[in-house]
Amino acid sequence: MASGQQERSQLDRKAREGETVVPGGTGGKSLEAQENLAEGRSRGGQTRREQMGEEGYSQMGRKGGLSTNDESGGDRAAREGIDIDESKFKTKS
């Protein structure tokens, strides 16, 4: 059984070979870099949710989830008659 230190060494080696070993760590060149990237991305999303409020963040996610390579989320929502309240996208004052 591999110890925690050995496991981290193996993950670091894989990361240095270009493999993503930490969810959200895409682009990091080492295990530590990937961990830092993942933490920053998570914190950024939480900050955005706090700025916009839960409802606005949810509406923005709905719109983004509708987008495709051929069509923006707003265009698709309009075409399919899906109601997205963009007034909730504003940050709280």
UniProtKB/Swiss-Prot annotation:
InterPro entries: LEA_5, Sm_Hydphi_plant_seed_CS, Small_hydrophilic_seed_prot. Residues 9-19, 38-52, 73-93 have a biased composition (Basic and acidic residues). Residues 1-93 are annotated as: Disordered. It comes from the Eukaryota. One of its GO terms (biological process) is response to abscisic acid. Belongs to the small hydrophilic plant seed protein family. This is Em protein. Keywords: Stress response. Wheat contains at least 10 different genes for Em protein.
